[in-house]
Amino acid sequence: MKTIDLTPREREVLGIIIQAYVVSASPVSSRFIAKNYNLGLSDATIRNVMADLEDAGFISQPHTSAGRVPTDKGYRYYVDLIMMVQGIDDDEKRHIDSNLRLFTIDRKDSSEVLFAAAKVLGSISQQLSVVMSPRLSLGVFERLDMVLLSSSRIMVILSIQSLFVKTIVMELDLDVSRRQIEMVVDLLNQRLSGLTLDEIRTSIAERLADCDTDQGLLNRIVRSADELFDESPVLDRLYIAGAEYIVSQPEFDQPQKVRDLICMIEDKTRIARIVDLDGVVVPQVMTERDVSITIGRENPASTEGDFTVVTTPYFVGNTMGRLAVLGPKRMDYARVVRVVNYMADRLSTTFSDVN
């Protein structure tokens, strides 16, 4: 879509309207701008500029209000060409660092770190926050352990690069001993260590074809490769927090709006689709990762046009997870972008320290 080039005056007025609307949640009038901002322009001149912005589709007049509010087009222009993203402030940085520091890097439950990240992100942004753990199919296999639960039942524990762990209970159609399990575990770790789960899943039969160690248990592992070494369900990869903050926003002052929001939060498959889609990259953020923003109906996975989604990836070895903030289009974009960006940096660093 071609971007309309606004004049410097129009850009300044549009930026003021959006910034004022983010704070007040009330339509912004020309009189308010003339009174509170030293633009050197009369009320009438500002009103004419706002009329031009409205004609071009950047702002609109809600009902009979004397003020104007931004449209999706206005928000998009602001994010792409007006917004200035500065570094994270000291209080925000301390809040994130102190919470992630609670988790030692040798702890074997990365889910605690990811849920803590979601809670902190929701608290700072005052929006709904989502952390999606990395896709494990590209994760590097470190080791496998088995726990004998009964003579025909075992627990298989897969340790994947950077503390990610997958646990599955398997029912066997044969009896096994602890000694048999130890021999199979040693063999699997020797043959499979350093491969990705995808590589193991597609080649495990060939890699174990010449082995004569306990064929019964080995064959059961090979037959279960799709279950053992496949991707975790997306519902198990989502950590959601911040619902208590987003419902306090003026946009959710009606019961039906709250019900719609709750339905969306409970539909994790839908949340995953919304978060996992790449939006428009924010050009002002120059990092190793892209921070992207989808506004309203730009995200085809969102049935409502009332939300903005800010997302960025974080990295764990050669795998990638995602962070996201979902909130009303009337959000402090610059603040959310810098917080999401810093949180992704810290998560990537936290997990890389393990390797």
Swiss-Prot record:
Pfam family, one: HrcA_DNA-bdg
NCBIfam families: hrcA
GO biological process, one term: negative regulation of DNA-templated transcription
GO terms for MF: DNA binding
Family designation: Belongs to the HrcA family.
Name of the protein this chain belongs to: Heat-inducible transcription repressor HrcA
Classification lineage: Bacteria, Pseudomonadati, Chlorobiota, Chlorobiia, Chlorobiales
SUPFAM superfamilies for this protein: GAF domain-like, Winged helix' DNA-binding domain
InterPro entries found in the cross-reference section: GAF-like_dom_sf, HrcA, HrcA_C, WH-like_DNA-bd_sf, WH_DNA-bd_sf, WHTH_HrcA_DNA-bd, WHTH_transcript_rep_HrcA_IDD
HAMAP family for this protein: HrcA
Repressor recorded as keyword: yes
Gene name, Swiss-Prot/TrEMBL: hrcA
Keywords assigned by UniProt, alphabetized: Repressor, Stress response, Transcription, Transcription regulation
Biological function: Negative regulator of class I heat shock genes (grpE-dnaK-dnaJ and groELS operons). Prevents heat-shock induction of these operons.
